[in-house]
Amino acid sequence: MGKNDLVKTLRMNYLFDFYQTLLTEKQRNYMELFYLRDYSLSEIAETFDVSRQAVYDNIRRTGDLVEDYEAKLNLYEKFEQRRKIYDDMKQTLNDSKKLEQYINQLEELE
């Protein structure tokens, strides 16, 4: 698995965590098996007695759907921003002015 594949898989895992409740049961099952449990398309197809192409199409469409949700709701983007601010705060625990700036940034995200 290349670096880009790993980055995409990590992003899809996060997007799935944020938006899985908006998906159908079939979409959740396919995404969970493919991205979280690392099943191959063939293994998923065999499990659900469908073609590899059907699984691929469903995963691709569902990936597009969660990306669309993210474009509208920005839950993952805000999560990443908060995580970066928290990391920065940990580095500046002795600098109260910096900490105040970071707290203000967090408040603006909400």
UniProtKB/Swiss-Prot annotation:
Signal peptide: none annotated. Might take part in the signal recognition particle (SRP) pathway. This is inferred from the conservation of its genetic proximity to ftsY/ffh. May be a regulatory protein. It holds the Pfam family UPF0122. InterPro entries: RNA_pol_sigma_r3/r4-like (IPR013324), UPF0122 (IPR007394), UPF0122_fam_protein (IPR054831), WH-like_DNA-bd_sf (IPR036388). Transmembrane segments: none annotated. It comes from Staphylococcus haemolyticus (strain JCSC1435). Belongs to the UPF0122 family. The lineage of its organism: Bacteria, Bacillati, Bacillota, Bacilli, Bacillales. This is UPF0122 protein SH1678.
